[in-house]
Amino acid sequence: MKNSYFIIHGSFGSPFVNWVPYIRKEIEEKNGVVYTPDFPTGVGYQNYDNWNKLLSVYLDAGLINENTVIFAHSIAPIFICHFLVEHRVKIKRLVLVCGFNNYLGIDEEYDNVNETMYFDNLKDVRNYADEIICFYSKNDPYVKYEAEKEFADTIATEQIVIDDGGHLNSESGYTEFTELLKYI
C-alpha cells in the first residue's frame, strides 16, 4: 500500500509558511498523497482538544494508519506524539523538527497555548511509529537546545543536529529543507 503524508505546522503557524509548502510540493511531485491540515492557532483556539478534534477527522476517515509518514514542526511534534499515544495509532514514520515537551519560557503567549499539548508518557510513542527522526538545532532562539535534545533522546531512532539552524523555520532560512527529502 502507498504511503500517505501529513505535515503539521507549529504554534501560530499555518500550512503556508516555513518549509511546509516545499515538502508538500516534493511529495506531490512523487505522486504522493499529502495532507496539510490548517490547525486553529492563537490564544483560546490553539490547544490539544481543538487540534485533536481536527486530526481525528482524518483518523476516523482511515487516512492515518501504518502507511502514514508525519512531518511536524515546533509544538506539532509533541502534539502528534500525544495524539498517537492517546488514540493508539501505529504509523510508519515520524519526522519531528525542533520538538520539545514540558518546556516553558518562550513567552507568556506561546507558553499558554503550548502547555496543553504536553504529556507525561512521551516514550510510549515509540510503540506507535516504526521510525522516529528528530531534527533540531544548537541555536534555536525559542526553545533551549537542552529541551530539544532531551525530547529527541527520549524517543528518536535517529537524530540530526544542525549547528546553526535556528528554529529551522523561514526566519532561519528554511523555506526549503532538503535534509527532510530522504524521509519521503
Ranges and model annotations:
Residues 69-71, 94:
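Conserved alpha/beta-hydrolase fold motif
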Residues 45-46, 165-177:
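Catalytic histidine-centered segment of alpha/beta-hydrolase-like enzymes
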Residues 10, 39-42, 95-105:
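Active-site nucleophile loop of the alpha/beta-hydrolase fold
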Residues 32-35, 153-169:
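Catalytic histidine neighborhood in serine/cysteine hydrolases
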Residues 141-147:
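Conserved alpha/beta-hydrolase "acid-adjacent" motif
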Residues 128-129, 133-136, 140:
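Short beta-strand/loop motif that positions the catalytic acidic residue
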